[in-house]
Amino acid sequence: MSVASDSPVHSSSSSDDLAAFLDAELDSASDASSGPSEEEEAEDDVESGLKRQKLEHLEEASSSKGECEHPGSFGNMCFVCGQKLEETGVSFRYIHKEMRLNEDEISRLRDSDSRFLQRQRKLYLVLDLDHTLLNTTILRDLKPEEEYLKSHTHSLQDGCNVSGGSLFLLEFMQMMTKLRPFVHSFLKEASEMFVMYIYTMGDRNYARQMAKLLDPKGEYFGDRVISRDDGTVRHEKSLDVVLGQESAVLILDDTENAWPKHKDNLIVIERYHFFSSSCRQFDHRYKSLSELKSDESEPDGALATVLKVLKQAHALFFENVDEGISNRDVRLMLKQVRKEILKGCKIVFSRVFPTKAKPEDHPLWKMAEELGATCATEVDASVTHVVAMDVGTEKARWAVREKKYVVHRGWIDAANYLWMKQPEENFGLEQLKKQLTEEE
């Protein structure tokens, strides 16, 4: 494991104690493979290195006027002064299983690294795995209609990297994984703008195996692979363990509720359902892409669309850099991009909300406004769209007479997920009626 070469902290120019220590003591493992014996060797290297570092820092600490603030530890030992400590601070197990940092040190590292990366015109991007970059199924969950896939896979043996291909059979895990179309181009282009993390609710072994499929040469993620075992809150994802300023972090995930504290950083992507088990998991009745022997479009799919959004937010952040960027917030840039999606649209809703509810409090109303639309409760000549579920409502009939667009709520949902205004003709009420009939 090479924290020195791969962690964003060590891409910075700071010469602080943590960076110096990790550079010196973990670099010896940077060229090793990921086999179990090598992990044990890396642990031994850290332990012996810790003893050497302890002697150096003890001498330095003894001549200092102030006491050591114990910025972090390996195991129960401060990596600055060597003093034994109680288990405190935030664990950074994905970097090293014994590593913990206190809040002040985390804040200092984030400040230092963010300043350095911004000089390189880079921000941070945290990426979910399942249904975002790829789709995985257990082999026993394959339908008979999907058995043909087994003859189209690349095989990933335990501990071996594979490059090329998009469908992988992981027999040692009894799994099959399909990479989302455009993912390799997405990662390559995104890496030029962002330091990237993987953050998954899967376990550590699964996370690392998926990282090998996505990044077989170790060019994009290094050790920045965070699993559910590394988080600070169960069943939630948080930026607590990401060493980047929240104002410089964007997140790509298919599940909004996974990030309750960081929704302003989040880009929600349409879920990738390649396998039938994925559709069943979310109670979708339509056939999966594998059953249809189809797939998303490379140039026009979800990842290609999101890449455009990332480029827009990145460009806005670094616009007019001569004016200074230290106080800029990429979350505001993301909101600015969203505001352009339905800009110029004025929407009236017809029997979409519960009768006694305040329309302006409904999530769909708020979503439309976040996308740049103006919402109203009454129709007039300036209205461009009526969102309804029944063409027989008074407002829907008015829209037809006045040659305004009548669409169902899916038009707004699609704009939200796809980050672009959608053709109204694809979301008419006749299409909705047909869809509901097919699902019955």
Curated annotation (Swiss-Prot):
GO terms for biological process, alphabetical: response to salt stress
Biased composition (Acidic residues): 37-47
Catalytic activity: O-phospho-L-seryl-[protein] + H2O = L-seryl-[protein] + phosphate; O-phospho-L-threonyl-[protein] + H2O = L-threonyl-[protein] + phosphate
CDD domains, alphabetized: BRCT_CTDP1, HAD_FCP1-like
InterPro entries in the cross-refs: BRCT_dom, BRCT_dom_sf, Fcp1, FCP1_dom, FCP1_euk, HAD-like_sf, HAD_sf
Cofactor binding comment, as recorded: Binds Mg(2+), Co(2+) or Mn(2+).
A GO CC term assigned to this protein in UniProt: nucleus
All copies of domain FCP1 homology, residue ranges: 118-292
Domain of life: Eukaryota
Cofactor(s) demanded: Mg(2+); Co(2+); Mn(2+)
EC numbers, comma separated: 3.1.3.16
Key word Ion transport present: no
Region (Disordered) residue spans: 1-49
Gene3D superfamilies per the UniProt record, alphabetical: BRCT domain, HAD superfamily/HAD-like
UniProt keyword list: Hydrolase, Metal-binding, Nucleus, Repressor, RNA-binding, Transcription, Transcription regulation
Pfam families given in the database record: BRCT, NIF
Record field: compositional bias (Low complexity): 1-36
An MF annotation (GO) of this entry: metal ion binding
Compartment list: Nucleus
Domain BRCT: 337-429
Induction: By NaCl.
Record's comment describing the protein's domains: The BRCT domain is required for interaction with RAP74.
The protein's role, per its UniProt record: Processively dephosphorylates 'Ser-2' and/or 'Ser-5' of the heptad repeats YSPTSPS in the C-terminal domain of the largest RNA polymerase II subunit (RPB1). This promotes the activity of RNA polymerase II. Required for normal plant growth.
Name recorded for this polypeptide: RNA polymerase II C-terminal domain phosphatase-like 4
